[in-house]
Amino acid sequence: MSSALAPVGIFDSGVGGLTVARAIIDQLPDEHIIYVGDTGHGPYGPLSIPEVRAHALAIGDDLVGRGVKALVIACNTASAACLRDARERYEVPVVEVILPAVRRAVATTRNGRIGVIGTQATINSHAYQDAFAAARDTEITAVACPRFVDFVERGVTSGRQVLGLAEGYLEPLQRAQVDTLVLGCTHYPLLSGLIQLAMGDNVTLVSSAEETAKEVLRVLTERDLLHPHPDDPRAAGPSRVFEATGDPEAFTRLAARFLGPAVSGVRPVHHVRID
């Protein structure tokens, strides 16, 4: 049985999942977390579903083996590729990023026209389209924005080049007259100002990061796994461990855009292996 004192494990293909980590830290400030960025293999968007599944489950195995009390798949592509496998494989609760965002979008839309943007792999998986299928009177327009992740990973989140790219990607959503847009990749919140500019103020952006953090809070509360309040004698100050399967220094530089100086001393992970 998991302990409330155990950490929450979070992973992504790179730094994008730090938007989820940031939201979890904001909403659950007492929780210990371990974050793994799979920069040695990511981004996952261009990979095949079997490749993504293999990389994601290897990291999941590692985190669960280290005793995390919950596993957060902070990557839309990985959520689409391996959620069912992960929930069958692990005894700890597994939280993903797709359904929380879908619920918020359905509750937010006024005209029933909802847009989704994500990596090519996420859009091709139809994970969002399938998740919206149960919602009545909704019309979904899904668009792949494959180059967005590359810009974010390089730290380029503004300027004419990326704005022009965004306008081209988002034009089908404007034609569809969506009033709600799901940012279906955890990298995309760093482009939210630019995306809002391209879409206009009448379109509401839904961040999977914020909604996923709310789902983590719900799951931990439901299972009596919330970390004790700081006044509780069992409690200790929250520890935040960040690891990368690639270059830890490069990860640290990029991660500063998400969490500022909170990310330091990133540890390289050499023991995550793909069978």
Curated annotation (Swiss-Prot):
Its EC number is 5.1.1.3. The gene is murI. SUPFAM superfamilies: Aspartate/glutamate racemase. Pathway: Cell wall biogenesis; peptidoglycan biosynthesis. NCBIfam families: glut_race. It comes from Mycobacterium avium (strain 104). Disulfide bonds: none annotated. InterPro entries: Asp/Glu/hydantoin_racemase, Asp/Glu_race, Asp/Glu_racemase_AS_1, Asp/Glu_racemase_AS_2, Glu_race. Substrate binds at D12, S13, Y44, G45, N76, T77, T186, H187. It is an enzyme of class 5 (isomerase). HAMAP family: Glu_racemase. GO terms for biological process: cell wall organization; peptidoglycan biosynthetic process; regulation of cell shape. The active site is at C75 (proton donor/acceptor), C185 (proton donor/acceptor). It catalyses: L-glutamate = D-glutamate. Provides the (R)-glutamate required for cell wall biosynthesis. The keyword Isomerase applies. This is Glutamate racemase. One of its GO terms (molecular function) is glutamate racemase activity. Belongs to the aspartate/glutamate racemases family. Pfam families: Asp_Glu_race (PF01177). Keywords: Cell shape, Cell wall biogenesis/degradation, Isomerase, Peptidoglycan synthesis.
